């Protein structure tokens, strides 16, 4: 009975529930490159679903790994220059005259399902437990309870608290505000942060 009330089991339950759906898979912290802000295997899988990808490689790059490295480098350069991850996910970017798409948003409903964007169904959501998000500074070696990735890119973080251990969503929010540096690159890049307990989910931020 105690194990069911343990915070780690609470986290494990959520991760396994998500990974059990058709929308998600479960990845490990070692799959994610903190410096490059990407799970490159998941990003590559999504890129391969785009008809332009093989043409781009053939015409402009030595091989697929070379092309992938440039895509990841471009993403990081744009983020470093102030472009938001949301903008990159929505708009993608041009590379060697071809549009690189990093995500596909839900198309408008039509009477003909064939009109829907086929790439939308190829989006890959991943859940990662206990993922380190910094290798230096204030946040060095800190871990996120859960992180959600879209096509390998980090979009959501969650800090979990189990009420059975005497902590609530308030403690989770406090942890974000006192133990997460607001200028951390990973945290600034993510779209949203949540504090969560057994009964409540609240938006929060790494600054007081």
Q: Which role fits each region the language model picked out?
A:
Residues 1-205:
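An alpha-helical interface "stripe"
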């Amino acid at each position: 009975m105690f194990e069911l009330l343990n915070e780690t089991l609470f986290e494990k339950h959520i991760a396994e529930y998500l990974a059990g759906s058709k929308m998600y898979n479960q990845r490990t912290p070692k799959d994610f490159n903190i410096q490059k802000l990407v799970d490159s295997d998941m990003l590559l899988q999504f890129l391969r679903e785009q008809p332009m990808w093989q043409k781009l490689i053939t015409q402009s790059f030595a091989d697929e790994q070379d092309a992938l490295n440039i895509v990841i480098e471009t993403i990081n350069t744009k983020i470093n220059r102030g472009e938001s991850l949301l903008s990159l996910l929505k708009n993608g970017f041009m590379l060697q005259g071809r549009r690189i798409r990093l995500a596909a948003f839900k198309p408008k409903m039509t009477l003909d399902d064939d009109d829907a964007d086929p790439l939308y169904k190829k989006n890959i959501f991943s859940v990662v437990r206990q993922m380190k998000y910094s290798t230096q500074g204030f946040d060095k070696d800190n871990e996120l309870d859960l992180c959600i990735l879209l096509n390998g890119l980090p979009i959501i973080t969650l800090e979990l608290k189990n009420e059975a251990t005497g902590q609530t969503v308030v403690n989770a929010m406090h942890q974000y505000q006192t133990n997460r540096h607001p200028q951390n690159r990973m945290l600034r890049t993510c779209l949203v942060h949540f504090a969560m307990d057994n009964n409540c989910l609240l938006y929060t931020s790494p600054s007081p």
